[in-house]
C-alpha cells in the first residue's frame, strides 16, 4: 500500500494516528514532502526483500546501520540494501582506527529503534551520519525505514538533508 504526498496523506494519517511513527511526525513538523509505503511484516525480512515486495529499486532503498568506534563514539551509516558496509572505509571516513556493528540488544536503548525498523531520523540522540555516495547519482527519491517494521519512507535526498546532518562517502564493499 502506498500513500500519496502532501495534504492527501496528512488527512489519511489523521484517521490512522496509530500508524504514524515518530519519523513521520518529525517529517511533518519540518514540512518535508514524503510518501509512506506499508508492507506486511512476516518475521525476519531483509532490506532486499522489503524493496522487492514494494517494487523499489534496491539501489534507491537504504538500510540504516549503527556502529561503535574504538573511541566509544557511535556512528550511523546508510547503505543501499543490497550492499555491505565496508568497516575499514567507514572507520576512515569518521576518523576512527576501527569500528564494529553494535550488538542487536544495544540498538533499542541507544537509538529508540529495533532491528529491522531503524531509521536515520528521530534517534534518541544525534550520531554522526554518513550515507553511501551512490546517493549522489540518484535523481529520484530514496527509501529508508519509517522507524517501525512494516513502514518505509520515500523522499528526495535533499529533503532528508533538511532533517538530519549527513555526509556522503564511499562506504560499501567493492
Positions of predicted regions on the chain:
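Extended, low-hydrophobicity, polar/charged segments
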Residues: 13-174
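Single conserved hydrophobic/aromatic residue that forms the stacking wall/gate
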Residues: 1-12
Amino acid at each position: 500500500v502506498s500513500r500519496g504526498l502532501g495534504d492527501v496523506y496528512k488527512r489519511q494519517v489523521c484517521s490512522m494516528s496509530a500508524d504514524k511513527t515518530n519519523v513521520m511526525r518529525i517529517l511533518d513538523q519540518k514540512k518535508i514532502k514524503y510518501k509512506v509505503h506499508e508492507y506486511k511484516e512476516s518475521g525476519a525480512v531483509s532490506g532486499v526483500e522489503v524493496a522487492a515486495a514494494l517494487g523499489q529499486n534496491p539501489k534507491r532503498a537504504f538500510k540504516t546501520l549503527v556502529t561503535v568506534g574504538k573511541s566509544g563514539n557511535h556512528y550511523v551509516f546508510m547503505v543501499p540494501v543490497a550492499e555491505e558496509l565496508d568497516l575499514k572505509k567507514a572507520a576512515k571516513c569518521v576518523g576512527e582506527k576501527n569500528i564494529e556493528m553494535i550488538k542487536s540488544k544495544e540498538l533499542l536503548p541507544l537509538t529508540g529503534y529495533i532491528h529491522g525498523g531503524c531509521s536515520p531520523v528521530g534517534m534518541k540522540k544525534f550520531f554522526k551520519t554518513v550515507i553511501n555516495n551512490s546517493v549522489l547519482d540518484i535523481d529520484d527519491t530514496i527509501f529508508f525505514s519509517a522507524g517501525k517494521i512494516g513502514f518505509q519512507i520515500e523522499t528526495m535526498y535533499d529533503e532528508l538533508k533538511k532533517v538530519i546532518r549527513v555526509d556522503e562517502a564511499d562506504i560499501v564493499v567493492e
